[in-house]
């Protein structure tokens, strides 16, 4: 077993420079999956080459897709929709919850046996939210108690199209069902009460699937997918990941005399809840050179040091920033006054109990906060004085690691995290980028 590698962040000043962050993780997973299903070749520029994404690539290769890297882009020769091969061994997703859940949806309706395994963290995460609709489609499942990994899917001879009301705001559940609908006769319908990230819908249309989207009288979103479409390979340019950019944005806002530009960041409306919240707190964040790339809105972000004030973040905003609450908690700790985050129970079933991990880390670093089942209240002091000095347990969670390294760049006293290795699952360049901008991490 590999040994943990602690690392410490120290109070920094004057972060400056331009950086271009790696591709969006959500779009990277989906590009590999749809490229692997399509006829012909798909060319992917800007793929996030993190451990999570590469595990999805390995899974698609195990089921017949040809995936190679050439120079700075990736080429996928897909199997054709409906033509995946049975994997000869279990698909190991490591820490990749998104990859595992989306591939479960994609492969569920295939009349074959597929086994999914993962690391200790992924094996604790709930899979029932994906397995329940697959069961309705006729998939038989052998799972560890409580619908956890390891698990095996036995696809039916002919899957049933379903009309499924997603019980929680989850782009992963929605996407898994839509991917299952690709190899299912008839019309598969997903009903989501609130908009979640919509990359799957956009990309399915781009690859040639027929989707119809409407609203019902209650305002819920109905997505109808017509089964057995002919998917054709595409050229994809993946914009930078706003969830990774979040920690750099927070660092630049809080470290004195900072002025940085993050180029080519995805600003899809379903992904900018954090930026909207930071604007309400008084943040100086500009969108420069706004443009569209592959149907997605993209901009360069200029961020300057700002004095922030506490706000209340409504629960309705949670789906558009669910991965960014750890970053927001850092901003809240140094803001003036109370910040209240509501409707965030989904944080409890991430790579760790992320809500608890954030609250513990804040308290260890002398920040007053209150943790509830579905909320977090942070009492900001408006100053770095007296804060920091903690040794933080990351719980094998990449976002907790980046959260408290960012905290340590601002606090009066250094902050040490117990292990930096898991940062590579989503943002391998994080520490080098912080150093490049002038941050002190060692």
From Swiss-Prot:
What keywords would UniProt list here? Amino-acid biosynthesis, Aromatic amino acid biosynthesis, Cytoplasm, Transferase
Primary location group:
cytoplasm
Q: Does the keyword Amino-acid biosynthesis apply?
A: yes
The residues that the entry says bind phosphoenolpyruvate are 25, 97, 125, 172, 354, 399
Q: Name one GO cellular component term.
A: cytoplasm
- Residues bound to 3-phosphoshikimate are 25-26, 30, 170-172, 323, 350
Alphabetized CDD domains for the sequence:
EPSP_synthase (cd01556)
- For this chain, the annotated S-S bridges are none
Domain of life, per lineage: Bacteria
Q: Where does it reside?
A: Cytoplasm
Listed EC numbers: 2.5.1.19
What Pfam families does the record tag this protein with?
A: EPSP_synthase
Q: Output one GO BP term.
A: chorismate biosynthetic process
A single GO molecular function term of this UniProt record: 3-phosphoshikimate 1-carboxyvinyltransferase activity
| Residue numbers annotated as active site | 323 (proton acceptor)
List the InterPro entries hit by this protein, alphabetically.
Enolpyruvate_Tfrase_dom, Enolpyruvate_Tfrase_sf, EPSP_synthase, EPSP_synthase_CS, RNA3'P_cycl/enolpyr_Trfase_a/b
Keyword Cytoplasm belongs to the record: yes
Fill in the subunit field for this protein.
Monomer.
Q: What does this protein do?
A: Catalyzes the transfer of the enolpyruvyl moiety of phosphoenolpyruvate (PEP) to the 5-hydroxyl of shikimate-3-phosphate (S3P) to produce enolpyruvyl shikimate-3-phosphate and inorganic phosphate.
Q: Its family?
A: Belongs to the EPSP synthase family.
Official protein name in the record:
3-phosphoshikimate 1-carboxyvinyltransferase
Per the UniProt entry, what species is this protein from, by scientific name?
A: Bartonella tribocorum (strain CIP 105476 / IBS 506)
Q: Which gene encodes it?
A: aroA
């Amino acid at each position: 077993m590999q040994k943990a590698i602690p690392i410490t962040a120290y109070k920094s000043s004057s972060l400056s420079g331009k950086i271009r962050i790696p591709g969006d993780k959500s779009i990277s997973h989906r590009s590999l999956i749809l490229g692997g299903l399509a006829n012909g070749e798909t060319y992917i520029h800007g793929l996030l080459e993190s451990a999570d994404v590469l595990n999805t690539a390995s899974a698609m290769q195990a089921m017949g897709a040809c995936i190679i890297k050439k120079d700075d882009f990736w080429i996928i020769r897909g199997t054709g929709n409906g033509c995946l091969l049975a994997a000869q061994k279990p698909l190991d997703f490591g820490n990749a919850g998104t990859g595992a859940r989306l591939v479960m949806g994609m492969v569920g309706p295939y009349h074959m046996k597929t086994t999914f395994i993962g690391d200790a963290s992924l094996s604790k995460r709930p899979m029932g939210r994906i397995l329940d609709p697959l069961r309705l489609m006729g998939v038989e499942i052998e799972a560890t108690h409580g619908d956890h990994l390891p698990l095996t899917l036995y696809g039916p001879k002919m899957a049933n199209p379903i009309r499924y009301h997603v019980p929680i705001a989850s782009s992963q559940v929605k996407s898994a069902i839509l991917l299952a609908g690709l190899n299912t006769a008839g019309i598969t319908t997903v009903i989501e009460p609130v908009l979640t990230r919509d990359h799957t819908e956009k990309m399915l249309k781009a690859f040639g699937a027929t989707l119809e989207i409407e609203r019902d009288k209650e305002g819920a979103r109905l997505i109808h997918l017509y089964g057995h479409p002919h998917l054709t390979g595409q050229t994809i340019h993946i914009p930078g990941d706003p969830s990774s950019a979040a920690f750099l944005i927070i660092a630049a806002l809080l470290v004195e005399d900072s002025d940085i530009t993050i180029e080519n960041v995805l600003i899809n409306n379903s992904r900018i809840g954090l930026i909207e919240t930071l604007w309400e707190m008084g943040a100086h964040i500009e969108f420069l050179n706004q443009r569209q790339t592959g149907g997605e809105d993209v901009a360069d972000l200029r961020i300057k040091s700002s004095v922030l004030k506490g706000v209340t973040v409504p629960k309705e905003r949670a789906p558009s920033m669910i991965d960014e609450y750890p970053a927001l908690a850092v901003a809240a700790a140094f803001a003036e006054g109370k910040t209240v985050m509501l409707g965030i129970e989904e944080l409890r079933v991430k790579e760790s109990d992320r809500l608890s991990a954030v609250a513990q880390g804040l308290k260890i670093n002398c920040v007053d906060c209150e943790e509830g089942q579905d909320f977090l209240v942070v009492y900001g002091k408006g100053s770095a004085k007296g804060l920091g000095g903690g040794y933080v347990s990351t719980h094998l969670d990449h976002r907790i690691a980046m959260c408290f390294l960012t905290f340590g760049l601002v606090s009066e006293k250094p902050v040490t995290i117990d292990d930096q290795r898991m940062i590579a699952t989503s943002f391998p360049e994080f520490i080098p980028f912080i150093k490049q901008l002038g941050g002190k991490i060692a």
